């Protein structure tokens, strides 16, 4: 049943996910579409990771971060999609209490880590364009590892705050989550305890990450733009712009979607609209699937490395 009664207390052992639709035919259609998207997401990001590892010309800080961004994108999509695909095939979509907490935490971890990685990549572009003579020392292997570890630690700390909040919530009976995965807001609505302090802490944690990473990105690109405008060479300007366009596109897609879902006032759109937007964010239509396409189509070094690897396979 998903609900256990112990004296005067009611314990929720599982949650019912209301999902996107109850229509059996539409469920099959959505299952097929989302499965295809998920397979493209995983294969595209794995290909990006493999290409960077085997191509010596891509062994630079920028692509070091890109390979980890691809890993995080797989994590973002995998934290939700497999369970969602299974539930499309079941008459009753459920997730265990523990599974819900894990899903919430993994989504927060990978989403937060992606924010930090995008900020680290912006800083890398800043150093490459604004301080080219100091780039090799300022972006040494040690510095890159420190930025990477810091990104994962930041993601872990933010995820920990959400996980601790979730397991502190009291659920007194209602266990129907009006979403297709365990997102924080629908779970808060089901809780019967006073969560005001926890909500403030979690909002502060998530808000701080957005503010800090956006500031790093904005400041980095402000200096980059100033430096580019001072360049006298048209070729130099074009090369600098081409270096940044892929990252700027990924940043715009990521923060634009996150802002629409989690920052805009809830009264400005319905829960159903929020669920549809979350599909774009979590499943891959907006971020995990697009990132490999963005970097492969807009980045000449990635395209050239791919051509070289394909040529080796053809003539080997």
From Swiss-Prot:
Keyword Membrane set for record: yes
Protein topology in the membrane: Multi-pass membrane protein
Entries under PANTHER family matching the protein: OLFACTORY RECEPTOR
Protein name: Olfactory receptor 5P79
Gene Ontology molecular function, alphabetical: G protein-coupled receptor activity; olfactory receptor activity
Any Pfam family: 7tm_4
Native species: Mus musculus
Sites carrying sugar chains: 8
Residues in the Extracellular compartment per record: 1-28, 79-102, 158-199, 262-274
Function (record text): Potential odorant receptor.
Family membership: Belongs to the G-protein coupled receptor 1 family.
Disulfide partners: 100-192
Domain of life according to the entry: Eukaryota
Keywords carried by this UniProt record: Cell membrane, Disulfide bond, G-protein coupled receptor, Glycoprotein, Membrane, Olfaction, Receptor, Sensory transduction, Transducer, Transmembrane, Transmembrane helix
An example Gene Ontology CC term for this record: plasma membrane
């Amino acid at each position: 049943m998903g609900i256990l009664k112990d004296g005067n207390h009611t314990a929720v052992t599982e949650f019912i996910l209301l999902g996107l639709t109850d229509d059996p035919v539409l469920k099959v259609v959505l299952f097929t579409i989302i499965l295809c998207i998920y397979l493209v997401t995983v294969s595209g990001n794995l290909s990006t990771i493999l290409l960077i590892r085997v191509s010596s010309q891509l062994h630079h800080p920028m692509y070091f971060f890109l390979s980890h961004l691809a890993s995080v994108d797989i994590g973002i999509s995998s934290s939700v999609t497999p369970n969602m695909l299974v539930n499309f095939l079941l008459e009753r979509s459920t997730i265990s209490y523990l599974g819900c907490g894990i899903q919430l935490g993994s989504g927060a971890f990978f989403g937060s880590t992606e924010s930090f990685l995008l900020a680290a990549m912006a800083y890398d572009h800043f150093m490459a364009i604004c301080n080219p003579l100091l780039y090799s020392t300022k972006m040494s292997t040690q510095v890159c590892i420190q930025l990477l570890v810091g990104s994962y630690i930041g993601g872990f700390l933010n995820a920990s705050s959400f996980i601790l909040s979730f397991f502190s919530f009291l659920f007194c009976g209602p266990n129907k989550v009006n979403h297709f995965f365990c997102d924080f807001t629908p779970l808060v609505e089901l809780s019967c305890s006073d969560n005001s302090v926890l909500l403030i802490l979690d909002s502060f944690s998530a808000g701080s990450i957005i503010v800090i990473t956006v500031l790093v990105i904005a400041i980095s690109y402000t200096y980059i733009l100033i430096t580019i405008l001072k360049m006298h060479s048209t070729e130099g300007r074009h090369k600098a712009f081409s270096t940044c366009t892929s990252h700027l596109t990924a940043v715009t897609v990521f923060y634009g979607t996150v802002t629409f879902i989690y920052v805009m006032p809830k009264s400005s759109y319905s829960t159903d609209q929020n669920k549809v937007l979350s599909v774009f964010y979590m499943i891959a239509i907006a971020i995990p699937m697009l990132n490999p396409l963005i970097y492969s189509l807009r980045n000449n070094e990635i395209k050239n490395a791919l051509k070289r690897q394909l040529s080796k396979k053809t003539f080997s």
